[in-house]
Structures are given as C-alpha cells and as structure tokens.
Amino acid sequence: MMSAMTILVLNGPNLSRLGKREPEVYGRQTLDDINRELAASFPELSFDFFQTESEGALLEKLFNCEDKGGYRGVVLNAGALTHYSIALRDAISAITIPVVEVHLSNIYAREEFRRKSVISEVCAGVISGFGANSYHLGVRALLGMTSLEPD
C-alpha cells in the first residue's frame, strides 16, 4: 500500500522531449528536472511519476491507480491528447480520484486547435500557462481538495 498522500503525476505524448522541443514555448527544463523539483518541494508527499507516448498506457495507469488504491490525486499533462482524446476523457470520468489538468503553456493563447480541451469538463480543475510551476500549482490544488478527506 502507498503512503496516505501519494500523487500520480501523469504525462502524455511529447513530454519526454521537454527541454529540446520548442523551448521558447515549453521552457528548457526536462521532465526529469520538473519531477525532481516537484519531489523536493513536497517532501511530505510520495509521488508516482509516469510518462508515455501511448494513449492506452495513460488509460491503464489511470485505471490501475484507482484499482490499486493509495492515490490521493492525479496531476495530468495529457499533451496533445488534451485536444481530442474522448477515451481519456471517459477514463477520467470513470475514476473517483480527483484529476487536475496542467499545461506548461497557456493553451488558450495558442493556436486555435490547442484552445479546446476535451478533458477539462471532467477534471477537478485546470492550470495552464505557468511553465513548470503549473505542476506545483496542480499539487497544491490537490492538497487543498484532499487534506480534509479521510484516508
């Protein structure tokens, strides 16, 4: 069983390329840098970091975190899947664990096709446009939502 405050940090397609792909948009930090900073900023928490290029693997991880138990929330950067994955939307709505959608860039200030999130309506909230700090804000949001709930 996991600690009482394990947070799943779930990253989708292309996030493995952080630091290399469009650094003017996404920054120069790698995903490993972001994960290390997140863990150091919240030493009282346990994190499960997962990144995949596969939509199916994201769905499986969401379902497994619900079935396995011990998770208090999910910070999700679904990458491009944000804009079109009805399967991901359905998976989020099928679990009871709160999911906070995060984005490094402000998706609402980008190209038209990036301004629509099909998962926002089934997430607990959305944090967008604060670079790597979006992940920190996502964790803080989950802590605010779950701190008073019993294990």
From Swiss-Prot:
Q: Which Pfam families match?
A: DHquinase_II (PF01220)
The UniProt annotation places substrate binding at: N77, H83, D90, L104, S105, R114
Q: Which GO terms describe its biological process?
A: amino acid biosynthetic process; aromatic amino acid family biosynthetic process; chorismate biosynthetic process; quinate catabolic process
Known EC number(s)? 4.2.1.10
User: Residues in the active site?
Assistant: Y26 (proton acceptor), H103 (proton donor)
Any one Gene Ontology molecular-function term assigned to this protein's record: 3-dehydroquinate dehydratase activity
Q: Which residues form a coiled coil?
A: none
Q: Does the keyword Amino-acid biosynthesis apply?
A: yes
Q: In which pathway does it act?
A: Metabolic intermediate biosynthesis; chorismate biosynthesis; chorismate from D-erythrose 4-phosphate and phosphoenolpyruvate: step 3/7
Amino-acid biosynthesis as a keyword of this entry, yes or no, is yes
Q: Where is this site: Transition state stabilizer?
A: R21
- Enzyme class label: lyase
Similarity comment: Belongs to the type-II 3-dehydroquinase family.
Subunit structure of this entry?
Answer: Homododecamer.
UniProt xrefs under HAMAP family: AroQ
What's this protein's name? 3-dehydroquinate dehydratase
Gene encoding it? aroQ
